[in-house]
Regions:
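Right-handed parallel beta-helix
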Residues: 71-197
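Extracellular beta-rich repeat passengers
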Residues: 228-389
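Acidic glycine-/aspartate-rich tracts in secreted/extracellular proteins
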Residues: 43-44, 68-69, 91-92, 260, ...
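Long, polar low-complexity repeats
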Residues: 172-176, 184-251
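Conserved small/polar residues in nucleotide/adenosyl-binding loops
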Residues: 391-398
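Acidic Gly/Asp/Thr-rich repetitive segments characteristic of extracellular carbohydrate-active
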Residues: 16-63
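Bacterial Sec-dependent N-terminal signal peptides
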Residues: 1-13
Length: 402
C-alpha cells in the first residue's frame, strides 16, 4: 500500500530493472515503457531493422532480436541516448554476438542483458585499441549475464559512474600481444564508481587489472564500491590493484591462480592498494591536474571471506599477506604507516544495495554454472569455464577473428 501512495516517479525508481537485478544499479529504468525496436538483420548499418538503427533512436526504447548470430560492426557502436534496454535474451538459438568494434556506453539509464562482446583486432588498422565493453562518467547502468572477451585494451571497463551494477558476466581472454601501442597488454578491466556493484562475475586469463579498482576524476571523492562473490582465475602480471582513495567492500570472492600466475606474492594477492602520488597529480609544467584532490588520500576497505585456492593462510587471514604485504610504500610516496594501516581497515562492511551473497566456495560453483551469456553458452564460454573447473587444462591465449 505504501508503494501505491508514492508519486509515480518515485515508485518507478523502486522497481528493480528486472527480476534478479541486484546491487547499486538494480533500480535502473532502462527503456521501460518505451518503444520496442526489433532487430531483424545481422547487418551493420543505420537502416531500419539493424541494431545500430535501434540504438541511435531517442527516447525510452527496448531492443529485441528476431535473429541470432554475429553482428560484425563497421565502426564503434556508441550508446549515446538515455533510457535504453538491449534484451539479448530475446534472440533465438545461441543469441547475439557483437564483434570487430567496441560497444561504448555514453548514456544514462542503460540495461544490457545476455549479449556477447568479442571485439578482436579488426579496428587496430583504423587506429583503435578497443575495450570489449566500456563506459564511464554516467549513471544508472546494469550489465547482466554478458560475455566479454578478446579486447585489445580492457575487456570490461564500466566504471566512474553513479549507481551501477555488473553482475553474472564472464570477462575473459583479453589479448596479450595484439598490437597495442604499449606492447604487451591484455587487461581485465577498470571497476569502480559512486555506488557501484560487481558481483558473481568470472574474470579469467588476463595479464593485469583483475580488476583494477579505478576511480575517475568525476567520482574520485565519492568512490563507493562493492566487490563480492566474483571468481578470479589465472591472472598474470599484476592481478587486482588500485583503490586510491576509494571505499570498497571485498567480500567472499574466490581467487584461483592458474598456469600464468607468477609464483610470487601476486599469487596470493587479494588487492595491491595504492594512492595517488604527487607525480601522478601534477602536470609536466608543475601545475596540479584533475587528480590533485586525492593526492596521498588512502582508501578504506572491508575485506573478509575471500578464498585463495591453495593458500590456507591467506584464506584464513585476508589482510596480512593478501592486502598489507602487497603494498609498495615507495610507490606510495612513503605515506604508508601504522596510522594508515589501522585506518584503512574497516571493522564492518559498507552498506550496499541488496545482493544475494554466497560463501566464496558457493559463489565459485554458482558463477561457473550461471555466469555469462548462459541462456545457451557458446563454445568459447564453455572452454573458459572448463579451464577454471579443471586445473590440468592449460590456459592459452586466443587471438582469433570471430
Amino acid at each position: 500500500m505504501l508503494l501505491l501512495c508514492l508519486p509515480a516517479s518515485v515508485a518507478a525508481q523502486l522497481l528493480p530493472a528486472f527480476p534478479g537485478a541486484e546491487g547499486h544499479g538494480r533500480y535502473t529504468t532502462g527503456g521501460r515503457g518505451g518503444n520496442v525496436y526489433h532487430v531483424t538483420t545481422l547487418e551493420d548499418s543505420e537502416a531500419k531493422g539493424t541494431l545500430r538503427h535501434a540504438v541511435k533512436q531517442k527516447g525510452a526504447r527496448i531492443i529485441v532480436f528476431d535473429v541470432a548470430g554475429t553482428i560484425y560492426l563497421k565502426s564503434d557502436l556508441k550508446i549515446s541516448n538515455d533510457y535504453i534496454t538491449i534484451a539479448g535474451q530475446t534472440a533465438p538459438g545461441q543469441g547475439i554476438c557483437i564483434a570487430d568494434y567496441p560497444v561504448i556506453i555514453s548514456a544514462n539509464d542503460v540495461i544490457l542483458r545476455y549479449l556477447r562482446f568479442r571485439v578482436g583486432t579488426e579496428s587496430i588498422a583504423n587506429g583503435g585499441e578497443p575495450d570489449g565493453l566500456g563506459g564511464m562518467d554516467r549513471k544508472n547502468i546494469i550489465v547482466d549475464h554478458c560475455s566479454i572477451s578478446w579486447s585489445v585494451d580492457e575487456c570490461l571497463s564500466v566504471y566512474g559512474s553513479e549507481n551501477t551494477t555488473v553482475q553474472w558476466c564472464i570477462v575473459s581472454e583479453s589479448l596479450r600481444s595484439s598490437g597495442h601501442s604499449k606492447g604487451v597488454h591484455g587487461y581485465g578491466g577498470n571497476w569502480g564508481g559512486a555506488h557501484a556493484s560487481y558481483h558473481h562475475n568470472l574474470m579469467a586469463h588476463h595479464e593485469s587489472r583483475v580488476p583494477r579498482l579505478g576511480p575517475r576524476p568525476g567520482t574520485q571523492e565519492r568512490e563507493y564500491m562493492d566487490l563480492r562473490n566474483n571468481v578470479f582465475y589465472n591472472w598474470a602480471g599484476n592481478g587486482c590493484y588500485g583503490g586510491e582513495g576509494m571505499k570498497v567492500n571485498i567480500v567472499n570472492n574466490y581467487y584461483k591462480p592458474g598456469p600464468a600466475t607468477p609464483n610470487s606474492a601476486v599469487r596470493y594477492r587479494i588487492a595491491k592498494i595504492g594512492v595517488r602520488t604527487t607525480a601522478y597529480c601534477t602536470n609536466s609544467d608543475g601545475t596540479p591536474n584533475a587528480w590533485k584532490p586525492m593526492e596521498h588520500v588512502w582508501g578504506q576497505f572491508y575485506v573478509d571471506g575471500n578464498v585463495i585456492e591453495g593458500n590456507a593462510n591467506v584464506t584464513a587471514d585476508n589482510w596480512t599477506k593478501g592486502i598489507y604485504e602487497q603494498i609498495n610504500n615507495k610507490e606510495c610516496d612513503n605515506t604508508f604507516n601504522d596510522q594508515v594501516k589501522a585506518e584503512m581497515k574497516l571493522s564492518a562492511p559498507l552498506e550496499t544495495e541488496f545482493v544475494t551473497t554466497h560463501t566464496a566456495e558457493q559463489a565459485f560453483k554458482q558463477v561457473l554454472l550461471y555466469a555469462g551469456c548462459s541462456k545457451e553458452r557458446d563454445i568459447i564460454d564453455e572452454r573458459i569455464v572448463k579451464a577454471v573447473s579443471y586445473t590440468h587444462l592449460r590456459a592459452h591465449e586466443t587471438e582469433l577473428h570471430l
